[in-house]
Amino acid sequence: WAYAYLRMLHHKNPTLYFQTLLAEPAFLMPIVYTPTVGEACQKFGTLPFLPRGCYVSLADRGNVKAVLKEYADAMLPKDSLGNPQCQCIVFSDGGRILGLGDLGAWGMGIPIGKLDLYTVCGGFDPNKTMPVIIDAGCTDASGNSAKLTIRDHAMYTGMKQNRVKHTCPQGTEVNTAYYGPDSFIGEFMTAARELFGRSCLLQFEDFNSNDAFPLLEEYRGKFLTYNDDIQGTASVAIAAVLGGIKLQKPGCTNLLGELQGMRVLFHGAGSANIGSAELMIREAGVPATSVLVTNSRGVIWKSADGAQGNFRNDEQKSVAVEGEPQGYDRTDLVSIIKHHQPDILIGAVGRA
């Protein structure tokens, strides 16, 4: 209820709302964003407040620019020429809300909360930000951790249909509408850039990992965009590790050099840990042989030719160790730690 109260306060008096958050950020941000926002998203349509944000559904295909413009004309400030001003768009399809799974259009709490975080901690003008939900449907109760029948709830206002998916060449299921010459994501990204200019940040948020990685690779070179779950979390994780090394060795003048000599175990193989592992290997210079990543099947491994292994997608394959682990239980975390004796353990799993 504290979450709902703060959302109502924002609706009635945005200035007072942000002044309140700025007065007690350490106390209030966990209510506005994680961890409280997860429960709020599970009940989003039933909470007594008027949420802000723009909903763009597959039914808007071909008219996405008009939908964004209608929202922008009504909600965003204008420049001297009457053009709406937007610094940042955080958009999600609700496909993987935190560790809770597919919450569909009820995932709007995440873009709203993330932009509030950027205002309080990053100085973004809240009047020039835009939370967006890409409504591509929602899976049934099997698609979320609490087994909630969100899609069939009387108060659910999103598209009451299952997500249309196909198996991509890499063997994973992806949202069909996001790929190909008529990509819905491509139409959205292009429309946003045409309306708000190339300097408007377009941030992917809480997409399913199977979509998050290929979409980031597709658009990162074409738009001002990034994926917070992959890149943002990875940056913070590596910074935390370097900070830990500095605390442990106050006189160290080469933190990266110290990190490069350590063994690292990533428990969990979602967007956060895969992004962190790749950043550690590619940018921090940690040898790939010193990095282990686990998924639900244990330590991720691949054969020498890459044809076999227990990886689930190309991203997991990229951080897999070569050769099937032997001599210990590769599915048991304690056994893995005893055998490999990592210097650093980073956990990012939906449920431990």
Please provide the spans of the model-predicted regions.
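NAD(P)-binding Rossmann-fold cofactor-contacting core
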Residues: 267, 285-318
